[in-house]
Amino acid sequence: MADTTGRIPLWIIGTVAGIPVIGLIGIFFYGSYSGLGSSL
């Protein structure tokens, strides 16, 4: 965990990029299941 100045740790990038992706996938599948995502 040392020498992180000027360099973003990979796990932070994965977490920040993964949460919205998982959220969008969850909303998409929930919308498709409930019928609201039929227009997508």
From Swiss-Prot:
Entry's Gene Ontology cellular component terms: chloroplast thylakoid membrane; photosystem II reaction center
UniProt keyword Chloroplast present: yes
Keyword terms of this UniProt record: Chloroplast, Membrane, Photosynthesis, Photosystem II, Plastid, Reaction center, Thylakoid, Transmembrane, Transmembrane helix
Gene Ontology BP, a term: photosynthesis
Name of one Pfam family that matches: PsbJ
Coiled coil: none
Membrane topology: Single-pass membrane protein
InterPro entries in the record: PSII_PsbJ (IPR002682), PSII_PsbJ_sf (IPR037267)
Transmembrane segments: 8-28
Subcellular location per the Swiss-Prot or TrEMBL entry: Plastid, Chloroplast thylakoid membrane
Domain of life: Eukaryota
Cited NCBIfam families: PRK02565.1 (NF002722)
Family assignment from sequence similarity: Belongs to the PsbJ family.
Subunit record text: PSII is composed of 1 copy each of membrane proteins PsbA, PsbB, PsbC, PsbD, PsbE, PsbF, PsbH, PsbI, PsbJ, PsbK, PsbL, PsbM, PsbT, PsbX, PsbY, PsbZ, Psb30/Ycf12, at least 3 peripheral proteins of the oxygen-evolving complex and a large number of cofactors. It forms dimeric complexes.
Function field: One of the components of the core complex of photosystem II (PSII). PSII is a light-driven water:plastoquinone oxidoreductase that uses light energy to abstract electrons from H(2)O, generating O(2) and a proton gradient subsequently used for ATP formation. It consists of a core antenna complex that captures photons, and an electron transfer chain that converts photonic excitation into a charge separation.
Designated name of the protein: Photosystem II reaction center protein J
Native source species: Pelargonium hortorum
Lineage: Eukaryota, Viridiplantae, Streptophyta, Embryophyta, Tracheophyta
Gene behind this protein: psbJ-A
